[in-house]
Amino acid sequence: SDLTPKYFFTLIDAPGHRDFVKNMITGASEADCAVLVLSAKEGETDTAVAPGGQAREHAFLLKTLGVSQIILAINKMDDSKFSEDAYKIAKEKGLKLVKSVGYKIENVPAIPVSGWTGENLVKKSENMPWYTGKTLLKSFDDFKVPEKPVGKPLRLPIQDVYSITGVGTVLVGRVETGT
């Protein structure tokens, strides 16, 4: 969908539940950038970034699949009553995680949000006057369009194969290089 004045985005939801890791891999393999969502709720970020945690697994997969640009969204700020301390704790743990998998933390914004109340998603939150950065949507404009190596031979990794009645076998993939 058309989200910002600068770019055209297609959003792919990759659920954080372990049962949907295959979907996350499929989505991430098609992505140029990502939003990694952590929780400001006490204890939830600890679980997510711990060994075996979903955020840890997702950060590793994003980096492995070539997603070089990410935003940390610190969600559930409403649960912590929009506490700056809760944000800072989750942010610190999130930045430590993404640094450990190879991201440069100076290029990773951490944005406090509430998906439940819509705080700081599109419009600045009045409940977080201590946060002076951009909203999540405005931060999308900071993503850079990655250069595509069109001068190289065609490389199209196949992600799935469908057998469609009346059509035949259809391969699904993404052109990584070439034209």
PLM feature spans:
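Conserved protein kinase catalytic core
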Residues: D19, T45, K81, N120, ...
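Conserved catalytic-core segments of large NTP-driven translation/proteostasis enzymes
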Residues: K88, L95-T179
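Switch I (G2) and immediately adjacent beta-strands of P-loop GTPase domains
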Residues: S1-E42, K63-L65
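Conserved C-terminal guanine-recognition region of P-loop GTPase G domains, centered on the G4
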Residues: A28, A34-N107
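Short, glycine/acidic-enriched loop or turn micro-motifs at the edges of active sites
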Residues: G16, D78, T117
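Alpha-helical membrane and juxtamembrane elements of multi-pass inner-membrane transport
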Residues: R18, K22, G53-R56, L156, ...
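Short glycine/serine/threonine-biased micro-segments
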Residues: A14, I25, P51, P112, ...
